Amino acid sequence: MAADDRHGQPMVLSRSGETMAEPLPLCHLNGKLLPLREARISPLDRSFLFGDGVYEVIAVHGGYAPQLAANIARLARSLGELKIRNPYQAGQWAELIRELAAANGGGDLYVYLQVSRGSEYGRNHAPLPDVEPTVFGFCAPLPPTPPELYEQGLSCITALDTRWARCDIKSVALLANVLLRQQAIDAGAAEAILLRDGWLTDASASAVHVVIGGEIRTPPRSHQLLPGTTRLLVEELAAAHGIPWSSAAVSEAALRGADEIWLSASTRGVVPVTRLDGQPVGDGRPGPVWKRMRALVEASWVPGG
């Protein structure tokens, strides 16, 4: 077990080498704040029986959630696509998130929200029309990023994208993602970068960006990949700061020949990939475009940044 983080929570190492903090003590369940250890959800909840629900992860830096509006919009879209009743308006979601973060001491943390279709008395593939959604949320400290990750980059593998056909929905049904991440770990890598029919989609738990000839390229939005909020931030920052960027399909050959590859995620910002399937990416070191984007992304974590 590693040292405690600033919240006093024990830090443990996952099999991928990442640090993971234990959840903070208070959670939200169906409109109430209560100790996480006292939270109870029915075993007949559809998220447990069917994976019938959606989730969202909101990064909070020093009490500030820079992508809050994008997170709430994506949550609402996922609920709408699954025809799960959205129990709150956007402002109510924002207040719930702020209240939960503040109740756990604020600072640098993430809020995990999960909304299931709800609990029925029985197991029915077709849900009953009057089922009430279950809303659950907890917090945990943001995992610290080891300095060597930024200095040396990540090693990744490529893998066949075996996820379902609606990856644009942030569904709690993540078995394929779990198996793909496990495949990467078993190969001694940090993450699996996914290919479908010879084209780049996502990584198992991140969005993927490549740099070719100084231009950032990210696969276009479709049902085959999640509309990542940090990916959206990268697009906005590139446009605002004159960094060449395009939403363009990336072939396997282009991926393997890229000058730079990065991963982006809410809890880590942007991180460089320096080895892919055992081969160096570019010159095998984090690249200059990534270094500039990292600085811009991390500046955005401060209000007014």
Sequence positions of predicted segments:
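Helix-start/capping segments and mature chain N-termini
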Residues: 2-99, 121, 125-305
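Signature of the catalytic double-stranded beta-helix
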Residues: 97-107
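Ordered, amphipathic secondary-structure segments that act as subunit-interaction surfaces
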Residues: 106-115
